[in-house]
Swiss-Prot record:
Residues the record marks as active site: 108
Keyword Isomerase found: yes
Protein residues bound to Mg(2+): 108, 247, 249, 251
Cofactor: Mg(2+)
Broadest EC class assigned to this enzyme: isomerase
Protein name: Phosphoglucosamine mutase
BP-aspect Gene Ontology terms: carbohydrate metabolic process; peptidoglycan biosynthetic process; UDP-N-acetylglucosamine biosynthetic process
Modification note: Activated by phosphorylation.
Gene name per UniProt: glmM
Molecular function via GO: magnesium ion binding; phosphoglucosamine mutase activity; phosphomannomutase activity
CC terms in the record's Gene Ontology section: cytosol
Family of this protein: Belongs to the phosphohexose mutase family.
Length: 452
């Protein structure tokens, strides 16, 4: 049976609509607490489980934090509160403090009226599917509050930000610093606003922070990795060397160079792989997704690096990396994984890896990507009737086949259904924008006619 609440990145939705309601989140905390308390070795040791709760800057975070805390306490689980903290910061602190689990209250790059809950295991990794299934099973049981002498306690982790800042700095080579560099750092009015500027400043950079005035309602609003125009303008206006864009929970990274040019996760993955080759002699392989630009795949293979495409979602990139024992993977949206540095995607750490690569090479980003020109992509979202059988359409198959034949060796076609709405996403990639547009529109027209 499929999971009812957990998606690929925890539980997410609009605040006030099920399941992001205070009563459900309280029960979720209780259910998760009971699963933690019954973990192998926990009952035998008699030790009380302790979880860390962090959040981003959405106004609803206060309400959901209180609900989670109450649920965990009712299950007999102690709670440590980190306050506003990037998602990767919660993952790190959970592991570093030897806690039972970490919980993040965030909807990442979504607007303020959405929120979500995601969990990390004791080792700083996202929960396995079977543990999420156990939590869902407990949600169906009655909430039996622990006796007063068995209730969990809560306390604030006062030095959470400082601990995470030091961790981030430790991933930057000791032989380097950022003196003489002017950086614009866009924190998206999100979880990194008290952390990211300090990391780069303490490494010596002249930091110009933007997106650091959260009010509960402005997270990701015209700033951050989902709206990089603000950063591009700020870099040019301040004559900065580089701009760093994070999203609301700081697990994504986009970079802007001194000219205002934007670099996405695909391009940054190539830069990091090339840096590892220069440093270590070789990189066996890297992981992208179905959406990774074909030009990056071609360039990596030309460099002798195997390339594997995972399903869309950093969870699936991580699965492929672990399966193969590789270190580097990314999504074009800016989720970058470097498993020898962190167990999860970390925008700040990824930025430091890019800066270290530039320091080592003595090159600019444009120079490191010389010869790699991203293929134009055309994406068309076609709305269909719910349940429409697009896979059974001969007309759609013919349109796809015609495009693939025309683009053989110089482009690709990707058709996938949305998991949240009756929409078919048609993406065509080609060396020339006109070809991508032509074939995408032809396929989209076939879909519209076949599913009308």
């Amino acid at each position: 049976m499929g999971r009812r609440y957990f998606g690929t990145d925890g539980i997410r939705g609009k605040v006030g609509d099920a399941p992001i309601t205070p009563d459900f989140v309280l029960r979720l905390g209780y259910a998760a607490g009971k699963v933690l308390a019954s973990a192998p070795g926990r009952a035998a040791s008699g030790a009380r489980p302790t979880v860390l709760i962090g959040k981003d800057t959405r106004v609803s975070g206060y309400m959901l934090e209180a609900a989670l805390e109450a649920g965990f306490s009712a299950a007999g689980v102690d709670v440590m509160l980190a306050g506003p903290m990037p998602t990767p910061g919660v993952a790190y602190l959970t592991r570093a403090l030897r806690l039972s689990a970490g919980v993040v209250i965030s909807a990442s790059h979504n607007p303020y009226h959405d929120n979500g809950i995601k969990f990390f295991s004791a080792d700083g990794n996202k929960l396995p599917d079977e543990t999420e299934a156990e939590i869902e099973a407990w949600l169906d049981k009655s909430l039996d509050c622990a006796p007063s002498d068995g209730l969990g306690k809560a306390r604030r982790l006062d030095d959470a930000a400082g601990r995470y800042i030091e961790f981030c700095k430790s991933t930057f080579p000791a032989a380097f610093d950022l003196r003489g560099m002017k950086l614009v750092v866009d924190c998206a009015h999100g979880a990194a606003y008290q952390v990211a500027p300090h990391v780069f400043h303490e490494l010596g950079a002249d930091v110009i922070p933007i997106g650091v005035a959260p009010n509960g309602f402005n997270i990701n609003d015209g700033v951050g990795a989902t709206a990089p125009d603000a950063l591009m303008r700020a870099v040019r206006a301040n004559h900065a060397d580089l701009g760093i864009a994070l999203d609301g929970d700081a697990d994504r990274l986009l970079v802007v160079d001194h000219t205002g040019r934007l670099y996405n996760g695909d391009e940054l993955l190539y830069v990091l792989v090339k840096d590892r080759i220069a440093t270590n002699g070789q990189v066996e392989g890297a992981v992208g997704t179905l959406m990774t630009n074909l030009a990056v795949e071609v360039a990596l293979k030309d460099a002798g690096v195997q390339f594997v495409r995972a399903a869309v979602g950093d969870r699936y990139v991580l699965e492929q990396l672990r399966e193969r024992g590789w270190q580097l993977g990314a999504e074009g949206s800016g989720h970058i994984l470097s498993l020898d540095r962190h167990s999860t995607g970390d925008g700040i750490v990824s930025a430091l890896l890019v800066l270290a690569a530039l320091k080592r090479s003595g090159k600019t980003l444009a120079q490191m990507l010389e010869g790699v020109t991203l293929f134009p992509q055309k994406l068309i979202n076609v709305r269909m009737k719910p349940g429409a059988d697009w896979k059974g359409s001969d007309a759609i198959r013919r349109a796809i086949g015609s495009a693939e034949q025309a683009l053989a060796g110089s482009g690709r076609v990707l058709i996938r259904a949305s998991g949240t709405e009756p929409v078919l996403r048609v993406m065509v990639e080609a060396r020339h924008a006109a070809d991508a547009n032509h074939h995408a529109e032809a396929i989209a027209d076939a879909v519209k006619q076949a599913t009308a």
